[in-house]
Amino acid sequence: MTKSVRLEEGDASKVLVPVGSNKGVSVMDLVLRLVGIAGTLGAAIAMGTNEQTLPFFTRFVVFNAEYDDFRSFRLFVIVNAIVCAYFVLTLPLSIVHIMRSAARGSRILLIIMDTVMLALLTAGASAAASIVYLAHNGNTSTNWLPVCQQYGDFCQGASGSLIGSFGAVVVFILIILLGAIALSRHAKRVVL
């Protein structure tokens, strides 16, 4: 039978955190980094290989739509490649955190760098999303017609690559939250 103890005001929010409790957080960090690699690499490859050719009246006159026709799409591919490389470079550090869950300085560095990469990836994905939106809907006030009716495959490829990139944005948010949780567990007593 458990003993009933009356708590003083404020005592309920102080919890003892067992040593080694960051191992699960570190494993989840590693898994999310692997998912981030898949998302950013897939997005960069999908956009980088995205092109469609349409014949016009004859087979000698054709119109091409390629990702490098738009600066926003070029930025998107470059940013996703940079973030993918960052994910790969931080995998060993994530593995070190599994073995040594008390590594505090490297966790702080990772949180800062993860936040920088999150901002970079969000900027690149948002720039590409604005162009994809214009391609799908056009802009009637400037007489820009939607081009996805003619270049359907190109627009589908661009939209699909955005899914991978914005998925990686969500992964970064989760990684930053996990890093903050791991840092907060380093103290002997944590106020929740």
UniProtKB/Swiss-Prot annotation:
Q: Which Pfam families match?
A: CASP_dom
Q: Which UniProt keywords apply?
A: Cell membrane, Cell wall biogenesis/degradation, Glycoprotein, Membrane, Transmembrane, Transmembrane helix
Q: Which residues cross the membrane?
A: 27-47, 76-96, 108-128, 162-182
Glycosylated residues are: 139
What cellular-component terms does GO give this entry? plasma membrane
Record membrane topology: Multi-pass membrane protein
**GO terms for biological process, alphabetical:** cell wall organization
Q: Which residues lie on this side of the membrane: Extracellular?
A: 48-75, 129-161
Q: Which InterPro entries match?
A: CASP/CASPL, CASP_dom, CASPL
- Subunit organization: Homodimer and heterodimers.
Q: Which family does it belong to?
A: Belongs to the Casparian strip membrane proteins (CASP) family.
Q: What exactly does this protein do?
A: Regulates membrane-cell wall junctions and localized cell wall deposition. Required for establishment of the Casparian strip membrane domain (CSD) and the subsequent formation of Casparian strips, a cell wall modification of the root endodermis that determines an apoplastic barrier between the intraorganismal apoplasm and the extraorganismal apoplasm and prevents lateral diffusion.
Please give the name of this protein: Casparian strip membrane protein 1
**Source organism of this protein record:** Lactuca saligna (Willowleaf lettuce)
